[in-house]
Curated annotation (Swiss-Prot):
Catalyzes the reversible oxidation of malate to oxaloacetate. It comes from the Bacteria. Keywords: NAD, Oxidoreductase, Tricarboxylic acid cycle. It comes from Rhodopseudomonas palustris (strain ATCC BAA-98 / CGA009). Belongs to the LDH/MDH superfamily. MDH type 3 family. The active site is at H176. It holds the Pfam family Ldh_1_N. This is Malate dehydrogenase.
Amino acid sequence: MARDKIALIGSGQIGGTLAHLVGLKELGDVVLFDIAEGVPQGKALDIAESSPVDGFDSKLTGANSYEAIEGARVVIVTAGVPRKPGMSRDDLLSINLKVMEQVGAGIKKYAPDAFVICITNPLDAMVWALQKASGLPAKKVVGMAGVLDSARFRYFLADEFNVSVEDVTAFVLGGHGDTMVPLVKYSTVAGIPLPDLVKMGWTSQARLDEIVDRTRNGGAEIVNLLKTGSAFYAPASSAIAMAESYLKDKKRVVPVAAHLNGEYGVKDMYVGVPVVIGDKGVERIVEIELAGKDKEAFDRSVAAVQGLVEACKKIAPDLLGR
């Protein structure tokens, strides 16, 4: 049986890490695409040469033409300019919007049946633009944000409580940025909600608030430490978890930037919410009832995403006609 083809648009740090993870997990064959000649070919060859050591048989190739992604079952998009110190995700808008238009056209022509995962920032606006540019069904185009943000939240909580990350569950909703909403009420350690752990004396509310703030600034913290780039290991792992749920029809419940059409009171926008991912793409949107501060924070986050989308519409009004 032929292996699935997984196309990676963008061969930077995340793209290379994605390619290696696909091989290690034997998820399929890999096509690394990039406009920079030699870069995808070099990374593909380097990773392929690790396969005898790591023991995987995935085939890896590099390409500078979109024809190479033809028939891909999954496309993961990392193309675009990364954030630099002092640069907000929003600063990237006009540059990366043009990239999404080009990538969307390539996917539309060569991989119209693919499940597409967007990682490019500013995420919620870029995945909206990518879906418009590609013309793919909205349930087949998602943004990777919530899995990463929730993983950061889980890691910080596990570190605080000195427990295994496997026993910590956490949900982060809303836009992928400063307005994201880590939901303390729905986050647990071995099924015990965080508010109960505060009552049990495991931590204080003030300390929990600090962890929530650190989660919101998780990406910026790494950007400031690296000084020459942004996170790539955790983002790649997060996207692979989403791809694996689709390829293996695992029906995992994960927070992603999904297209909302009335859910959560949001219309024709991509916002981070929990969904079920199976072999049809987004098979169900899990609509959590939000109230009080959580609802206010989510609404603020949606408004921030709306502002980015409106800016996209002004920069590229032709996207609306697609």
